[in-house]
Amino acid sequence: MAPTQNLFLVAIAFAVIFTASTVHGRHNGAEDIVHSSCEHASYPSLCVRTLSSYSGPTITNRRDLAQAAIKISLSHAQSAAKKLAVVRDSVGKKKQEKAALVDCVEMIGDSVDELSRTLGVLKHLRVSGGSAKEFRWQMSNAQTWASAALTDDDTCLDGFQGMDDGEIKTEVKQWMTKVARVTSNALYMVNQLDETRGKPHDVHL
């Protein structure tokens, strides 16, 4: 084989190895951030499981992590909203669950809107080049929206308290408990982002 061909093959092999090691390093870095950040979340195991399986952009810092957590929560809320709407429309007006379902659909709709607003704030968060005052204002908005979303999730669940157990109640509790838990974890990540912000020039968020 000619020397030129040998060099070409060596170059290709090196490129493949370098790319693989880089991807592996990023993956390990993301796993480290996820595990360390989820340790004190409201639901640590769920936190690790959902964020580890996140298929969005690579998580390289805490801002990425907070955005990923909110996206996961938003996805669960949107899925639950669709299911709840179907159940609401299929239940007779005289059923005791009807009023609770109507309220729950409204609550989860508000939750979806609030999580979307939270995500919008995080996407435009000034982690560098901005003043501490501006950062605090942005974080206050993100925390307010995420907290409101969690409140709406809990309010939906509260609407079924005192009702007889049944298929509808069981399904709604299952869906909304999952939404509330991932939202609680997401709120924790947003709060952690605020606590670890540091100075205005800190870009390792």
UniProtKB/Swiss-Prot annotation:
Species: Arabidopsis thaliana
GO cellular component, one term: apoplast
Protein function: Pectin methylesterase (PME) inhibitor that can target PMEs (e.g. PME2 and PME3) in a pH-dependent manner, mainly in slightly acidic conditions (pH 6.3 and 5.0) but not at pH 7.5; this processus relies on changes in the protonation of amino acids involved in intermolecular and intramolecular interactions. Regulates de-methylesterification of pectins in the apical meristem and affects primordia formation and phyllotactic patterning.
Domain of life: Eukaryota
Localization terms from the record: Secreted, Extracellular space, Apoplast
Induction behaviour: Down-regulated in leaves during infection with Botrytis cinerea.
Disulfide bonding pattern of the chain: 38-47, 104-156
GO molecular function: enzyme inhibitor activity
Keyword Secreted listed: yes
Identification of the protein by name: Pectinesterase inhibitor 3
Secretion signal, residue range per the UniProt entry: 1-25
Tissue distribution of the protein: Expressed in apical meristem.
SMART domains (alphabetical): PMEI
Pfam families, per database record: PMEI
GO biological process, one term: regulation of shoot apical meristem development
Family: Belongs to the PMEI family.
UniProt KW Disulfide bond keyword: yes
